[in-house]
Amino acid sequence: DRWAPLDALTLDAWLGRIAGEALLAGRINARQAPRLALSVFQERMLWARAIDADAAQDSDLFDREGLAVAVAAASDLAEVWSLPLPKDGGDGGNGGDVSEELRSFLRWRRHFHADCEHNGWLEPARLRAWQLRAIEAGACRLPARVSFAGFDRYTPQEHALMRALAARGVEVEELPLGRESAGAATLAGFPDRQAECRAAAAWAAGRL
């Protein structure tokens, strides 16, 4: 029998695959899907445009590209960790305690979201939220089991994904990496490279 490779993907790649399959199968209305999933570079360019468009700031005083990278990272964290933010650049009922930096961020974020909404774009963090809603709606075809591996901690967005998968009947598990104790090393000699390759293949097959 031919060995089947492990279907291991990053979270974003897997979500993109199952949502893309649902779109092609017609289980997701194309009109409800984003026209474009922004790449990291495209997202940063859009943030830079939002910063430039802010009449309250003199963008010539900033490292625009560096600021766009920092603002994109901050917005991503706010999305995936479900951080509460004041709306519309106000103080959120905090009596004016919001810093000028946060007010600027909120203005840029509002401009960024308006630009995305007008053009039908989504940056990675909100794209994941859209894909999660597609899973919850039953639009995506799911495997019987999904294993999470390599996460040192889970964001609220990832916990929501786990709950959505479990609600759809998927077995969700966490795959531990590494070993509880060090393995034992064994030294072996072989007459030539071909024999060594055959032995390595047999060793790997015995552990699959």
Residue ranges and their predicted role:
Residues 14, 152-154, 193:
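Short, solvent-exposed loop/turn segments at secondary-structure junctions
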